[in-house]
Amino acid sequence: MGFVKVVKNKAYFKRYQVKFRRRREGKTDYYARKRLVIQDKNKYNTPKYRMIVRVTNRDIICQIAYARIEGDMIVCAAYAHKLPKYGVKVGLTNYAAAYCTGLLLARRLLNRFGMDKIYEGQVEVTGDEYNVESIDGQPGAFTCYLDAGLARTTTGNKVFGALKGAVDGGLSIPHSTKRFPGYDSESKEFNAEVHRKHIMGQNVADYMRYLMEEDEDAYKKQFSQYIKNSVTPDMMEEMYKKAHAAIRENPVYEKKPKKEVKKKRWNRPKMSLAQKKDRVAQKKASFLRAQERAAES
């Protein structure tokens, strides 16, 4: 079919329909959302859960949500900016941090539903493929589906780091190893050791060592926060191991106590009826006294 110029006449503008607001803003892929949200018709009121992963400049957001007419309902959430509590104070947007955030989300969710002792997940990090299976006589494994949003789902994307963390944490999420670091598209083989290195932050540690040898100034600029927090390349693996253990030990979100704000009054409060009557009586008495003094003088 050849090129056809769109004639923007009166009929075009009269029949024009704007796209959904979030499509206009470039925030939602409705083609993908439709397939992630619509539940099987034989499951009736059962929600279809999604694991939402969003990577920002300074944070990684992981949420478990399901769709309702009123809007998406968030069941549980975990954020990378909460990782300093577990000992990870630097590199909060790298692959290792994404894994930790996914792990925190999974353990927090299972703890909320009382399933954390039933589904421990994979405690020792190997980087290899692992799938959670339901245990007979126990509640079924919590199943959800990855929602990567508008992120480009290339091999090694941090979104899949969060996915791996959630799966190792005990959630059942359909996936394959094709998008994990360590998968070779030419040989069609997956190297679990390469994936484990990324989970343990060894790719960052190797780059730190390289910069320390090659360019000291670039190292100080690139890893200023690591230097400030005294994090060396040799400490990285142990730091993440301790973080994984700490997350499993206490994944519960602690609510901050509400600050009591003392209300300030900037205008005078209204007087009650009794106060108004009393004020009038005082003014009358004052006026009468003034009249009496004037008469005496």
Swiss-Prot record:
Modified positions (N-acetylglycine) in chain numbering: G2
Protein location: Cytoplasm; Nucleus, Nucleolus
Record cross-link Glycyl lysine isopeptide (Lys-Gly) (interchain with G-Cter in SUMO1), residues: K220
Example GO BP: ribosomal large subunit assembly
SUPFAM superfamilies in alphabetical order: Translational machinery components
Stretches with biased composition (Basic residues): 258-268
Superkingdom assignment: Eukaryota
Chain positions found as Phosphoserine: S185, S272
Primary localization: cytoplasm
Pfam families: Ribosomal_L18_c, Ribosomal_L5e
Modified residues (N6-acetyllysine): K5, K48, K220
Molecular-function GO terms, alphabetical: 5S rRNA binding; structural constituent of ribosome
Xref: InterPro entries: Rbsml_uL18_euk, Ribosomal_uL18_C_euk
Keywords: Acetylation, Cytoplasm, Isopeptide bond, Nucleus, Phosphoprotein, Ribonucleoprotein, Ribosomal protein, RNA-binding, rRNA-binding, Ubl conjugation
Covalent crosslink: Glycyl lysine isopeptide (Lys-Gly) (interchain with G-Cter in SUMO2): K220
Subunit structure: Component of the large ribosomal subunit (LSU). Part of the 5S RNP complex, which is a LSU subcomplex composed of the 5S RNA, RPL5 and RPL11. Component of a hexameric 5S RNP precursor complex, composed of 5S RNA, RRS1, RPF2/BXDC1, RPL5, RPL11 and HEATR3; this complex acts as a precursor for ribosome assembly. Interacts with NVL in an ATP-dependent manner. Interacts with RRP1B. Interacts with IPO5, IPO7 and KPNB1; these interactions may be involved in RPL5 nuclear import for the assembly of ribosomal subunits. Interacts with RRP1B.
Family: Belongs to the universal ribosomal protein uL18 family.
PANTHER family given in the database record: LARGE RIBOSOMAL SUBUNIT PROTEIN UL18 (PTHR23410:SF12), RIBOSOMAL PROTEIN L5-RELATED (PTHR23410)
Name by which UniProt lists this protein: Large ribosomal subunit protein uL18
The species this protein was found in: Macaca fascicularis
